[in-house]
A protein has these predicted regions:
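Extreme N-terminal, non-catalytic leader segments
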Residues: 5-31
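Glycine-rich phosphate-binding loop used to anchor ATP phosphates in small-molecule kinases
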Residues: 79, 83-145
Length: 237
């Protein structure tokens, strides 16, 4: 793992780079940031961009390694429990590696928040399966690193569905808009009550954090100013 690079944002003009570095020098930057949000909202893209911009280590979910995922999207009722447990064990392993990693590593960015894990389980599992999942979850989540900042990306369900269609992932083709609506509602409910860490809620419906440099830079500047409590980033057209 590399140390934090205090000169940070790549692919930006020199004046902005200097300004962001000056802003950052005035604050205590979060040592662990978790980016969250429903399928298609762009959490992995943002996590990767932030990690690259500031030369930080990044922890990413690996859905392509979950052998149950494709079967789950074809038949959620039959394959919900194994797909959920596989993701849980994968996320736990990554966080345990983070805890045991280089003590000098200053910043990590992940595209998941382990506290949110039961959200998917509650949506997809029946009551008996959920009780089994919850028993496993509660036994293995102890003593894990907690983020210093959670960034929750939001978008309307229609926008999420359109983004999924546009990116053309074969595994995701069976995903219905109604399922995305269930997940979106569950995320909204979860983060409405979430207060365990500082939280930045970002409305992504009219911005493009993947390819629009101005949208991305403006969000980075807002992140640099985010300290404690709950914050909302809601850019206007």
């Amino acid at each position: 793992m590399e140390r934090t690079n205090c000169l940070g944002v790549m692919k930006m003009n020199d004046n902005l780079l200097i300004n962001l570095d000056l802003e950052r020098s005035k604050i205590s930057f979060p040592s662990y940031i978790a980016v969250e949000g429903p399928i298609g909202v762009g959490k992995t893209t943002l996590a990767k961009r932030l990690a690259k911009s500031f030369n930080y280590d990044v922890l990413l979910e690996e859905p392509e390694t979950n052998p149950f995922l494709e079967r789950f999207y074809r038949d959620r009722r039959t394959h919900a429990l194994p797909v959920q447990l596989h993701f849980l064990f994968q996320r736990i392993q990554k966080l345990q590696n983070l805890r045991q990693g280089d003590i000098f590593q200053q910043v990590q960015i992940s595209d998941f928040l382990i506290d949110k894990d039961p959200l998917f389980a509650r949506v997809t599992l029946d009551d008996d399966e959920y009780r089994l999942y919850q028993t496993v979850y509660e036994k293995i989540i102890t003593d894990l690193p907690r983020p210093d900042l959670v960034i929750y990306l939001q978008a309307p369900t229609a926008t999420l569905f359109e983004r999924l269609q546009r990116r053309g992932n074969e595994i995701e083709k069976p995903v219905e808009e109604s399922y995305l609506q269930q997940l979106n509602d569950a995320y909204t409910q979860f983060f409405y009550h979430y207060d365990d860490t500082p939280l930045l809620i970002v409305n992504t419906s009219i911005i493009n954090l993947a390819t629009n440099e101005s949208d991305y830079i403006n969000l980075v500047k807002y992140i640099l100013q985010t300290q404690s409590g709950r914050h909302y980033y809601n850019p206007q057209p």
